[in-house]
């Protein structure tokens, strides 16, 4: 699937469409804090399976019970529709 770079108008509405995500330097970023490492790693596993199915992979880190995810599309050198779709799907995986 070819990625489409987001327009300035689309970028301005990201905060409304994606609760919890922030926009910085052509990247979407979000951080989650879990009760422990096992919960954090379980969340990362679910995200990994989702990302693989969508063929769009995050940049991320895990420090004990904290997971940070950044999304960008290298092919278009910025944010694309693929980043929005993955962020929306990740939000549906959230615990609680």
UniProtKB/Swiss-Prot annotation:
Disulfide bonds: none annotated. The keyword tRNA-binding does not apply. GO terms for biological process: tetrahydrobiopterin biosynthetic process. Keywords: Lyase. SUPFAM superfamilies: PCD-like. The keyword Membrane does not apply. Its EC number is 4.2.1.96. It comes from the Bacteria. It is an enzyme of class 4 (lyase). One of its GO terms (molecular function) is 4-alpha-hydroxytetrahydrobiopterin dehydratase activity. It catalyses: (4aS,6R)-4a-hydroxy-L-erythro-5,6,7,8-tetrahydrobiopterin = (6R)-L-erythro-6,7-dihydrobiopterin + H2O. PANTHER family: PTERIN-4-ALPHA-CARBINOLAMINE DEHYDRATASE. Belongs to the pterin-4-alpha-carbinolamine dehydratase family. This is Putative pterin-4-alpha-carbinolamine dehydratase. It comes from Prochlorococcus marinus (strain MIT 9313).
């Amino acid at each position: 699937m070819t990625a489409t770079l987001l327009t300035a108008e689309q970028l301005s509405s990201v905060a409304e469409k994606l609760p919890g995500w922030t926009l910085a330097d052509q990247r979407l970023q979000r951080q989650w804090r879990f009760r422990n490492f096992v919960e954090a790693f379980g969340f990362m596993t679910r995200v990994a399976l989702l990302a693989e199915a969508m063929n769009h992979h995050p940049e991320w880190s895990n420090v004990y019970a904290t997971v940070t995810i950044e999304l960008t599309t290298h092919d278009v050198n910025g944010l694309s529709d693929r980043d929005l779709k993955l962020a929306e799907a990740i939000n549906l995986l959230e615990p609680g």
